[in-house]
């Protein structure tokens, strides 16, 4: 989560000056493989950047074989020699003229290692003075790439990261997660040189805001922990130690037992969603546990839902009058949200399925790709500070921009549309995984080509869906904006392509060319409807639709409420 940056667009030079960019509300999430419904390990994070017109560019950094003399560098003066050979990895970087560095955000490499970083966090004032940041030290701007380019395992990724902090220092307080098919780690960098790393339990989950989270640890622990040499002595010398049965509570000690509601509340709501039985009402003074057991196995839908959460169902609902200042997980300033699912039974180079919601999860869709991709769609590589056609980011962000204007009227309709698309993509990805395993077993190049083409096809399909959704949403927003005083605004409901939605729900779709009647059959159920008529017939009974179906370019569209009722 970047703290400050400069944004400049030459095209807008006459009207827009350099503007500060700040990050407010990145949220990290972890689901251990024994806690997930499908046995995958999940690490996830939302980026947060303000202002919110901040394009992300998705690309693949190729494998480099035996080319010594290269360096990894950052605009703050950080320079680190690279190994002669570096691994291929994916990344989700800032647009090139953003002015504050690369910010790879989330990387998965050919060795099956994935890293997401960072969630920024701050220690107390006394700690900052004792362990000051290093001005030209390691920043989030290059951190994920520094790990992904040269780490063959998650553990090696942790060790490489900590060696960098030891040698070059850190310019920021950061939280990072690194995972592979065998294990997952969390790393907390507290200042210029002090840190703690912990292997995350496979049977637990975690959701956290911008605050250090590692709790009670034994300073003598070696299995599953790595501590900087002077971590505990620094805590003791500053008189900050908070102990229990001889163990140090790192989060309480490093922060001098302080929490910010804007961060702590996001940690609490994650716990409340995944394990309501073990957490009560929100309490500002509570240091919520980093890890806990979920009440039920966690699904991918659960994780997506958390990243769309705005404290609905609580008194802190960010959309209620008086709660406008609440720092929810889902915010308008999110340029992308990513969820990395690591499959133990997938080929190493494609072990991770990364789901990316361009423009933020609340009003966008999660697009999947396997980590073995060797290239990304051209629309992912569009690099511009201002709106441009054929851009993944802008295609989805324009929907977010409209829906954000009135969540009461527009959010549910947008989320309903994307939830259906995500359900269909999840079903497809189950088949894709099996096909990928078969192809990789035959030939690695075949496997790579397959997953690359598939990712590009899914991007193209969902961009087309986004354009359809945007057109409908823009129509309703424009209608509502022009209403006379006292008129009731329209609540948005999207339409979706009937054939693919009905087939996904298990229906056979027939069409009568003579009268244009469309028939859906599933077992004993039979539904008949026509474009232009808001009345359908289900098993002999008339049913009123919320709007009449319509046909455009040979595709019949029906209201989402009709599909939800199938």
Give the role of each language-model region:
Residues 1-9:
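Bacterial N-terminal signal peptides that target proteins for export
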Residues 26-140, 160-285, 289-290:
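A contiguous strand-loop segment
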